[in-house]
Amino acid sequence: MSLWLYLAIGAGLLAVLYGAVQTASLMRASAGNARMQEIAAAIQEGAQAYLKRQYTTISIVGVVVIAALAFFFKSWEQPVGFALGAILSGAAGFAGMLISVRANVRTAQASSESLAKGLSMAFTSGAVTGMLVAGFALLGVAGYYYVLLATGHEATGRVVIDSLVALGFGASLISIFARLGGGIFTKGADVGGDLVGKVEAGIPEDDPRNAATIADNVGDNVGDCAGMAADLFETYAVTTVATMVLAAIFFRGTEAVSAMMLLPLAICAVCIVTSIIGAFFVRLGKSQNIMGALYQGLIVTGVLSIPAVWYVIHQLVPTAVEVDGRSYGADALFYCGLAGLVVTAAIVMITEYYTGTGFRPVKSVAQASVSGHGTNVIQGLAMSLESTALPALTIIVGIVVTYNLAGLFGIAIATTTMLSLAGFIVALDAFGPVTDNAGGIAEMAGLPPEVRVTTDALDAVGNTTKAVTKGYAIGSAGLGALVLFAAYTEDLKFFSENAAPGSFFHGMGAVTFDLSNPYVVVGLLFGGLLPFLFGGLSMTAVGRAAESVVAEVRRQFRDNPGIMTGEVKPEYGKAVDILTKAAIREMIVPSLLPVVSPVALFFVIQAIAGKVDAFAALGAMLMGVIVTGLFVAISMTSGGGAWDNAKKVIEEGFTDKNGVLHKKGGETHKAAVTGDTVGDPYKDTSGPAVNPMIKITNIVALLLLAVLAHGV
């Protein structure tokens, strides 16, 4: 066993240890007065009840998949890999939720003391979630790779490759359910609560008289925290696995194959250490710039990662490796890793530009709100479409540069390096729901107005960090899916060239993705429609969930007038229960769409035109999903973020181009609320859920190849 494999496992354990130590420190902080603790307890109870029901539902699907893998592969390694990926992905999300629902009330209390203490508390809780995500993912992949080698399997053998792919499938399946189910819950509560509370009743956000308030705060945790944690766990694990699979295929038969397979694990290991160091640099300076404090930690992490990645690559690849006429040298691979870090920085800046309150896109949506509801929606849609251009161009440049440096393996190394910072990026994301909840608790507990000013300042930054991390997740998902597609084409080539007589692939010949083949066009079109259909199903699900919340909140206002006067407390649990049932019910069909579609397309085309065209159509489908999925996801998340922050700009006081001041409660604000209700499911449900949808489609295609190769 290589020392680097032990170091990767050790880095995973270090991340988990960091999480445990910081959690203990966080739990020692004051949880505020009795009223604050009562509200926090209600949020905790709702979040835990929802996630338990969600994971119970997912486990039923998981058991079916495990049984299918055991039947097809007739060995323990692949089913165990799937179970490990699923359990760790679920654990990452659940742990993130457990931390955030305890940090929210402590952040509210810390914010009553100072902005610096509020920032420190919120970011610490986010860092715990981030390091647990990175730690669990690295432990899962490196640990299971160690077990497979220790049980006598060859590193480049099909058992190791198929088992690691199965691990990625387990992570992907949990991720899409968590992302979609959590998104339906949180946006059903948010949209439903806003429509009745803000628009109809004229009461502010997080007002305790709104029966959907607790459900909204529960949703922040199960959607933005648990959902994002599972999403980035899956992207981290799947990309690492895909890079290892490519290394096993590209460098099979060379002395460098073991080192190349360890390279993604080693890069992730050193970047966990740099992320932990960077977390200690998040401090509020004299300027009181919250975003600057967070970026300070991110910059330190990125700067430290550069020499760390250089060292790892030069240790594992001391001399250039020649394969099929291409040279893979340490310097070329390092520049690929550096390109991954540059792409990360560029996507972060671009996303902040399109969603930050100080820039043209958000201001233009706020200005459009002056004219009314329709113009707000038109401008928001315009920004959502425009926001796809720069991220796509950034990814294009990244692909061209890394491919010319080191081919498809160079793209894989760039994506791995990009994702190696996931620990810190998740910390930025989990910061958002904690600050949002802290503001809600401060409002409901009746804390002094200056506390709400502090939590609002943190929440405004939290909205931007959530948008930024979504941009990062989408960009990394797009590149990660490209790596998976490369693994599909290389696996297909391997099985075709090494098929035993009588096997499924024997005598099949080469598969090409030629646009003159109508079945390739069919695959492209079929793959291209999936993100749109998936987005439509998830948006419809949020609409239905919101309708049920609107009906319940209206019923409570109508049946109990004492709620509006503050004499009677609403039945918060009713809205939570309604949303829990709705989210679980609505998430099933969209989540299974990317699992069933590749299998269905393959067998339908095989029946019509044969194996070669079926594999060509399936590969083209993967390309179609990647291209349209990337644009749909970016458009939805950035556009939704612009709508959300345009509303916040107006609530803080917006001066239009004619010098007129617009504030909360006016017609301009009502128009902005309408835009926000459209943008909410855009940015927090449909858009983010497209990420795992893209990757799970590719993972299923990879597993299908392995199953067919086993003689099914």
Swiss-Prot record:
Enzyme class: translocase
Highest taxon of source: Bacteria
Binding-site positions, Mg(2+) 2: 217, 220, 436
Site positions per UniProt: Determinant of potassium independence: 466
Residues that hold substrate according to the record: 187, 683
UniProt-annotated binding residues for Mg(2+) 1: 190, 194
Amino-acid positions noted as binding Ca(2+) in the UniProt annotation, renumbered to this chain: 644, 676, 680
Main localization, broad class: membrane
GO MF assignments: diphosphate hydrolysis-driven proton transmembrane transporter activity; inorganic diphosphate phosphatase activity; magnesium ion binding
Reported cofactor(s): Mg(2+)
One GO location term (cellular component): plasma membrane
Enzyme Commission numbers on file: 7.1.3.1
Site, as annotated: Important for ion transport: 179, 224, 231, 684, 695
Reaction catalysed by this enzyme: diphosphate + H2O + H(+)(in) = 2 phosphate + 2 H(+)(out)
Family label: Belongs to the H(+)-translocating pyrophosphatase (TC 3.A.10) family. K(+)-insensitive subfamily.
Quaternary structure and partners: Homodimer.
Role this protein plays: Proton pump that utilizes the energy of pyrophosphate hydrolysis as the driving force for proton movement across the membrane. Generates a proton motive force.
Full protein name: K(+)-insensitive pyrophosphate-energized proton pump
Taxonomic source organism: Caulobacter vibrioides (strain ATCC 19089 / CIP 103742 / CB 15) (Caulobacter crescentus)
